[in-house]
Amino acid sequence: MDPGVEKKKQQMELVDVESGGLPVERQDSLFREAVRAEHAGAAHWDEQDSWGRTMSLAFQCVGILYGDIGTSSLYVYSSTFEHGIGHPDDVVGVLSLIVYSFMLFTVIKIVFVALHANDHGDGGTFALYSLISRHAKVSLIPNHQAEDELISGYSSSGKPSATLRRAHWLKQLLEASKAAKISLFLLTILAIAMVISDAVLTPPISVLSAVGGLREKVPHLTTDQIVWITVAILVVLFAIQRYGTDKVGYSFAPIILLWLLLIGATGLYNLIKHDISVLRAFNPKYIIDYFRRNKKEGWVSLGSILLCFTGSEALFANLGYFSIRSIQLSFSFALLPSVLLTYIGQAAFLSKNPKNVANTFFAATPISLFWPTFIMAIAASIIGSQAMISCAFATVSHLQSLSCFPRVKILHTSKRFPGQLYIPGVNFLLCVAACVVTVSFKTTVIIGKAHEICVILVMIITTLLMTIVMLLVWKINILWVALFFITFTSTEAVYLSSVLYKFTHGPYVPVAMSVVLMVVMIVWHYVHVKRYKYELEHTVSTDKVKEMLESHDLKRVRGVALFYTELVQGIPPIFPHLIEKIPTIHSVLVFISIKHLPVPHVDTSERFLFRQVELKDYKVFRCVARYGYRDSLEEAKDFVVTLLENLQDYIRDVNLYTDEPHTISAHSSCNHSFSREKPSGRYAVHAEDMLTPIESFSEITALSNYGSDRLPHFKASKMNMEELAKIEQEQMFIEKEMEKGVVYILGETEVVVRPHSSLLKKIVVNYVYSFLRKNFVQGQKMLFIPHRQLLKVGISYEI
């Protein structure tokens, strides 16, 4: 059948219903896609559950996720025994601590608990915050819309139960308390700042540990020479980031797998050759003996021992497209035995050679395997560092979607893998910081002390957010939640106290970096929220818009104008400012808001929301383009084509229904609660009136709350060809105006504080924020807007 005929047939079928008492829905442009996307998501996970795909993913994730954890064995013992081994049994005590710390934090907490808190395949602190944000309105930006909850995979409810009531109570508590919202936000950005600081410290400590192995063969090498070799490798590592890893990424898994086999075999060799009795470390009594014997020094050493599970946070954050089963399989059968064997083997070696603790890993390597091990160590350390650098890029991208970071240029290095990012400015700063850290600290022991606080703080914050997820999202038994919370907060608090005791010996560096990052995030987010609230309070009224559109001085020009605004509700105050300066309006005007939702991805079929602004003859529309925090913005040309196609669909849908007074209005006196029902029995009506700050973009009211006499009426049981032709004519008008040209109108808002504001507020807004805004990427570059089609409109807000 001809596609055009089929399309018209579907339109006729859509309205071929009787209006008398049948619950009908006034669909928004996206509402009809929700169930389709939901089924698509189910099919996706079914595909992931196949064993063939699981085994393939298990192999691939070895190279992407395990590089950092797999190279920690290069420096753990040397960092722990900084002043030498005091007692022969200390080696067994430390090994016991390493084994149980690794099992508790990496295996149990991350691999078998935290991975289940992934956000549709995305992990890390940001994913946990997004999960919480979807189930409770904790965002500080007042731009939530009822339609957001219609996005497939947004959130779900459950059957009435004690756990559900507890979750509802927690939801109300988080939404009602501004202090709770701010605390949750600060915890999240602190963890994110620590992850970025970790990306500065991981490359130096990993590469420096690997390069340090040269001293086993070239003992006359000085510390400075080792440092400068490391710096050279780091510069090359950061320089190649612009090319992406998709061309060489396929080799990561074989390299890391070979590395794990190598260190596992070497560990087994050392265990058999030197001292098999170190296996008694699996008895936890040696941990107690270690603390009794060393007292304060044993407690202080915990900070270095926690380096054995560094990389666990990156494993969770870089979860990406890997399934939970694939990670658990590869972790259990590849990483876990290899890592345990290498720590056990090094302990066996140290029990017979306690003076070789400064470079335990390479000293314990058989002579015949030294050079292969050295080369593999360099390669593995680079791959492990690459994972943290990529994690930093993704984190900055997520921060921008949260409106917590200035605009930076983000490049996608792979068409095949959309998640591979490169941020030139961030890459340069990471490179400089990593080189400065290497040259300043010179040894892995000091860098390790700095690294410790990043690892433990991210772990603690993950525990806190996981506890909220268990109560609010998972809704599991309170006893399991209490067990998880008490076990991990108590043990992590002990590790944190050990790290803080050595604060002046290294941890102050990542703390200082994190403070700077947090100041930038807080200032940017604070001003963004204030500016948004200002625009919301000064939204242009319906009467004012009608007055401007009906003005005789207002001229119409051919073409389409896209007016970008961050406001998702109503018309921004910059619009009358533009009309006052340039009394001209295009034939089609679309107010566009780019909005990021707390979901990883928004399907293109669910991207756009439309609403027409009165007067309808003027063809003025409001549009919200919704993206997930991992979605990238399209090129302007592609974006416009997709937008106008969806606009034409909206015009078709909205004209299928009458605008008789019976249509339920947003201003109706019956203002019932919003409802979100699937299209299987109950439907909803969307208001057509232009929005005010207190209204949703398209308010949804359950029709069951109304009498049958108040249901929307169709023009006829079947639309005639004349009406269909009218719809097609309006669609053609949009298409012709697009051919005349598209103009992008971008507001340049200068934010200043009121004259009588406090000195601190003046410094934050007038100086710090102003500096950030002027020295980072401008809006048109972020949106890929061609310069010759750009019109900037300046305005100043006093907040």
Swiss-Prot record:
Where it sits in the cell: the answer is: Membrane
Keywords attached to this Swiss-Prot or TrEMBL record, sorted alphabetically, are: Ion transport, Membrane, Potassium, Potassium transport, Transmembrane, Transmembrane helix, Transport
| UniProt xrefs under Pfam families | K_trans, K_trans_C
Which regions face the Extracellular side of the membrane?
Answer: 78-93, 203-219, 273-301, 350-362, 442-452, 497-508
All ranges on the Cytoplasmic side of the membrane? 1-56, 115-181, 241-251, 323-328, 384-420, 474-475, 530-799
Q: What is its main location?
A: membrane
Biological processes, Gene Ontology terms: potassium ion transport
Q: State the annotated membrane topology for this chain.
A: Multi-pass membrane protein
Tell me a Gene Ontology molecular-function term this record carries: potassium ion transmembrane transporter activity
Q: Which residues cross the membrane?
A: 57-77, 94-114, 182-202, 220-240, 252-272, 302-322, 329-349, 363-383, 421-441, 453-473, 476-496, 509-529
Show the GO cellular component annotation of the record.
membrane
Classify the source by domain of life: Eukaryota
Purpose: High-affinity potassium transporter.
Q: Which PANTHER family match?
A: OSMOTIC STRESS POTASSIUM TRANSPORTER (PTHR30540), POTASSIUM TRANSPORTER 21 (PTHR30540:SF28)
What the record says about family reads: Belongs to the HAK/KUP transporter (TC 2.A.72.3) family.
Protein name, UniProt field: Potassium transporter 21
User: Which source organism?
Assistant: Oryza sativa subsp. japonica
Gene symbol of the encoding locus: HAK21
